[in-house]
Amino acid sequence: MEQESELLSLNTLARILTLYFSSEKGTKITPSALELITQYLRIYSKEAVCRAYEEKKNSIMSSSENEDIVLELEDLENGIAAQLALDFS
């Protein structure tokens, strides 16, 4: 597997998760579980960007315009996010 710089630290991820699970007393997460969640989020994010890029590339090619492909937030929101959530569930 390729080496990547850690953009989201495990401490940050743990803090984000505790915001959503703080109502349950004694809920803990192990470092190995944090690593797994980090990998899952990394794969999910890459897949979202790849799908949005391919979708945008196909729409640009069909309109026969010769322009650079630049992704916007809307490209991820329009159809990609819903289908990706279903595929990863």
From Swiss-Prot:
Transmembrane segments: none annotated. The keyword Glycoprotein does not apply. Keywords: Cytoplasm, DNA damage, DNA recombination, DNA repair, DNA-binding, Meiosis, Nucleus. Its main location: nucleus. GO terms for molecular function: DNA binding; protein heterodimerization activity. It holds the Pfam family CENP-X. It comes from the Eukaryota. One of its GO terms (cellular component) is CENP-T-W-S-X complex. One of its GO terms (biological process) is double-strand break repair via synthesis-dependent strand annealing. It is found in: Nucleus; Cytoplasm. The MHF histone-fold complex is a heterotetramer of 2 mhf1-mhf2 heterodimers. Component of the inner kinetochore constitutive centromere-associated network (CCAN) (also known as central kinetochore Sim4 complex in fission yeast), which is composed of at least cnl2, cnp3, cnp20, fta1, fta2, fta3, fta4, fta6, fta7, mal2, mhf1, mhf2, mis6, mis15, mis17, sim4 and wip1. Belongs to the CENP-X/MHF2 family. Component of a FANCM-MHF complex that promotes gene conversion at blocked replication forks, probably by reversal of the stalled fork. FANCM-MHF promotes non-crossover recombination. PANTHER family: CENTROMERE PROTEIN X. This is Inner kinetochore subunit mhf2. It comes from Schizosaccharomyces pombe (strain 972 / ATCC 24843) (Fission yeast).
